[in-house]
């Protein structure tokens, strides 16, 4: 069976319009995220330290749209520092205080301690279908208030899009 161009034109137009209507533009954001957490040692050798982290914090947006402002955050993961180079990763759940909607983020640390990248894996409510990501860099490190803990802030920059409903 041979399909004519005239027969396919309405279907193609419908598909393009449907896709264009559901697509969303990338939106940039930036924030300072401050958190406190616990460190659990897993291994320690001459040129190697491996530890797990469990942290909680708050996102302080500094972009004009105040994207993710006052979202609370919980992250877990593990990090290894081998001969001064860092590697590791984990996951974070961010909660919008106004709606309870969440985003789930996967983070990966870079070789330089305190830096890395992240990407959005999923979201609920207004964040359903979120995609995007960015990078982070340590902005402030303090002396731990208690042994086995840490407190710090990271500068976060990225972009995301959410399909229009």
Question: Where does each model-flagged region fall?
Answer:
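Bacterial N-terminal signal peptides that target proteins for export
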Residues: 1-10
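Cleavable N-terminal signal peptides
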Residues: 11-13, 23
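N-terminal signal peptide c-region/cleavage motif recognized by signal peptidases
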Residues: 17-20
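Beta-strand-enriched cores of mature, soluble protein domains
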Residues: 24-165
